[in-house]
Regions:
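Extracellular calcium-associated, cysteine-rich motifs in secreted modular proteins
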Residues: 1-67
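Acidic, Ser/Thr/Gly/Pro-rich low-complexity segments and short DxT(G/T)-type signature motifs
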Residues: 59, 212-213
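Activation on beta-sandwich/Ig-like modules and their edge loops
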Residues: 65-209, 226-233
């Protein structure tokens, strides 16, 4: 035909062979006549997919979402010295609050990620913050954390406070592109427990008050370790 300068449309995709980069394979005009391939079936075309053989959402360019969760949270430190969760020798309710994060995926670089309490930014993870596969990071409200904490990464809130409200709060973690990665609603757990809430069993379970779990042997919290005090890995 005249439109195709005398060239046929061999693959019948509506694009004449002289303009079709894949003349024997039906394709899309936006892709110069070549097929729009999505090898992993995640809805992100291979040409735009940073992980073409691993399904993942568009917001992460086709790569899997970060696999991180909150395993334990202390928003109501116990009274007096038993509430010294960060181990610095003093009980200060804002400083002894903590959030324990567990990474159940591969090594995860969270440099530049941020933690918000409701709308307030409370912490930005500094450059070089990488949680290893199966690793833990404990974020305290402040103070001078003293102890091994199961070999976990330990940081204090860059804004000097977490300020988790005993009557309920909403914690959100954003990645370096300001995409929400993790949300946690404290409100269902808001009963002024004077101890932490932790998953039981660790990682996979629902949240329960720490001291009531048999393996805790009465301990009120376990930042950086499993509920029985053992290391995660």
């Amino acid at each position: 035909p005249i439109e195709g300068s005398g060239c046929p449309d061999s693959d019948g995709d509506g694009i004449y062979d002289n303009e079709d980069q894949c003349p024997d394979e039906p394709g899309d005009a936006e892709n110069n006549g070549c097929p729009l391939v999505d090898a992993d079936g995640d809805g992100v075309l291979d040409g735009l997919d940073d992980c073409p053989n691993e399904p993942g959402p568009a917001q992460y360019n086709g790569c899997p979402s970060p696999q991180i969760l909150i395993n334990e949270v202390l928003y109501d430190p116990p009274n007096d010295l038993p509430g010294d969760a960060n181990g610095d020798g003093t009980r200060e309710p804002q400083e002894d609050e903590f959030i324990e994060f567990y990474n159940y995926g591969g090594d995860l670089d969270i440099s530049g990620w941020s933690v918000h309490d409701n709308a307030e930014e409370r912490h930005i993870f500094p450059d070089g913050t990488v949680i290893p596969a199966g690793g833990v990071l404990v974020l305290f409200g402040g103070g001078t954390p003293t102890g091994t904490f199961g070999g976990s990464i330990v940081q204090v809130a860059s804004e000097g406070i977490l300020n988790m409200n005993n009557s309920g709060d909403f914690v959100t973690v954003y990645d370096s592109n300001n995409i929400s990665v993790l949300t946690f609603d404290i409100e269902p757990l808001s009963n002024n427990p004077n101890e932490s809430y932790t998953r039981n069993p660790d990682i996979t379970g629902e949240f329960e008050q720490h001291a009531g779990i048999a393996e805790a042997n009465g301990a009120l919290f376990s930042p950086g370790t499993m509920v029985d005090g053992s290391n995660f890995n």
